[in-house]
Amino acid sequence: MISVQNAAFQYRDDLIFRNVSFELAKGQTAAILGPNGRGKTTLLKSIVGLLPLAQGSVETFGHIGYVAQKNHMAFSYKVLDIVVMGRAAHVGLFRTPGLNDYKIARATLDRLGIDSFADRLYTQLSGGERQMVMIARALASECEVLFLDEPTSALDFFNQALILKLLRRIVAEDGLTVLFATHVPQHAQYLADAVMLMHSVDHQDWGPAEEMLTETNLEALYGVPVKSLEVEHEGKVASNLVPLFV
């Protein structure tokens, strides 16, 4: 579970957000949604503990995993070694990863369908492949709460769909609690049980996804008309949010 009460963040003289409060139950997925520059990443990092709040409190129950928006590696590590880094909390500061840690890392790669990446260099991977590796590293930590910052940022449609389907499957199988930041309403619609709309410093709306992701709310959030369209594909009907560029 995640509990945030009256959270505020200030950078120098600029207030980024304030009076943010919500609770996310165990096993639920929530999205922090809004245009660029509304403080989504800052809020997520504050909840994770990477940035200090100016006021308020955060409680996270369970071991956490975190996938950043940008994952640069100073050295050209092999994929398996990067995933093993996710075992750091279990290994501790004064010993090296053991056979069991490598076994868990390999099993995680296999589960995500990227076991063939194990001996490849991270720097030689595509953007989508790198994101899969970082998700594997987080999952190898055996986390109960997973935080993701723009998990499909800068990826093409194929890799966006790949990552979203993977996350949906893993969440269902493991019962993870997930909080992710995104600027794409369709991704929140696909994954989230609950959504926070980041309108401004003082205005955030929180509630069930079906109540937050309405045409009226999204037009107010983005300043662009949005329509919800029913689409049938392979015998299934899904509602899809579509911006209207007119």
What kind of region is each of these model predictions?
Residues L33-P35:
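The feature captures the beta-strand-to-loop junction immediately N-terminal to the Walker
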Residues L146-E150:
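Catalytic Walker B motif of ABC-type/P-loop ATPase nucleotide-binding domains
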Residues V48:
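Helix-to-loop junction immediately C-terminal to a conserved catalytic motif
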